[in-house]
């Protein structure tokens, strides 16, 4: 009977709460801060760059804040001979060409047909990149809304996961289903990691499954509406006992001069490692910066107990002012800057793919 009672209490705790009014969302804006908001209030938060988790479908996650496991990340790079030839394959022109297509959709809103179509396009590109690699796969991750997340998996010798992620959705802050090319936010990050994946799988050891760890590349749905897709993925990984040893987030990579290395809601040891990768494999200048609670998808990994890092296009406050509007277009972006971010991703992924963690 005690077991049945415990199960009943557990089911009650997991039940979806009833909003005060239809259409409201439960958002978390701090470790102990949750509140119900209307659709307008939620989109005002987006326009005002207030980070939040939408936990309407995962209310139990409000009390989840697992401390990320500590790993001894490498203190030195070990694979320059293998990585540097891959960096030469990074093409700013190719990133630009892909981004022109990706930002041509009217919007990539998470609950619109155009958001579904843009996700399908990403999946097709990723499949073309990894389709001939034995054991590799690209799959859709379905959610409770229209747009799926996309996941590419390149198996290694272990099931430990090194993940790279970027959100694929876009939003018009004044009219969520209005025009939102989202070239920088976050077409730039999405195409940056696609370019990095293309370079990485040209390496015979990566393609041959000889890496110590498994590589995953994620394109998340619904980031703009409260980190929805990344929450689903990392909470599921946590529940399934999967071991994500590192996650690198790429959200906006095309604007500004000095990259921002985000130091809040991220893992300090992984961030230190990431700076070493920047110094070794890119020509980028960077400075420390903070982006606040739940500002992007690395926060979902961090909350689920996985070490994460985030390198942003600029120090917060010096980033692209045109995001969340019809003016977030490719003409304002620097493809060479995106290529430097892609080099970061290649170095990060390769070094950790072969690291003993």
From Swiss-Prot:
Its cofactor is Zn(2+). Belongs to the peptidase M28 family. M28E subfamily. Pfam families: Peptidase_M28 (PF04389). This is Probable leucine aminopeptidase TRV_02148.1. Binds 2 Zn(2+) ions per subunit. GO terms for molecular function: aminopeptidase activity; metal ion binding; metalloexopeptidase activity. Monomer. It comes from Trichophyton verrucosum (strain HKI 0517). Residues 169-188 are annotated as: Disordered. Residues 1-15 form the signal peptide.
